[in-house]
């Protein structure tokens, strides 16, 4: 049973697709941009009263590309008001 769950997860796993804005091997900027895009989208949709689920694509991409420690640090910085990005 557990083996089937793992196989299903592997089969359904999707990583970040190619983005022509970031053609180089180093994907740091891609990670950063998708993190910002997710939170900008979430903020805009919340303000307009729209469906926030349309922003999930950005979240999946940055979670696929970014190291967990970076995301944790950025989330803490946003909570403290010291995040350097413009959201």
Swiss-Prot record:
Keyword annotations: Disulfide bond, Mitochondrion
Residue positions of motif Cx10C motif: 55-66
InterPro entries: COX6B-like, CX6/COA6-like_sf, Cyt_c_oxidase_su6B
Pfam families named in the record: COX6B
Domain CHCH: 28-74
Subcellular location, record wording: Mitochondrion intermembrane space
Motif position, Cx9C motif: 31-41
Source domain of life: Eukaryota
Role summary: Connects the two COX monomers into the physiological dimeric form.
Name listed for the protein in its UniProt record: Cytochrome c oxidase subunit 6B1
Origin species: Macaca mulatta (Rhesus macaque)
UniProt lineage: Eukaryota, Metazoa, Chordata, Craniata, Vertebrata
């Amino acid at each position: 049973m557990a083996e089937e769950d793992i196989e299903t997860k592997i089969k359904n796993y999707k990583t970040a697709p190619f983005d022509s804005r970031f053609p180089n091997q180093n994907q740091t900027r891609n990670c950063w941009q998708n993190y910002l895009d997710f939170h900008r989208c979430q903020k805009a949709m919340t303000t307009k009263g729209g469906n926030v689920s349309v922003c999930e694509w950005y979240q999946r991409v940055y979670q696929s590309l970014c190291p967990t420690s970076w995301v944790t640090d950025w989330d803490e910085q946003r909570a403290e008001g010291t995040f350097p990005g413009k959201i």
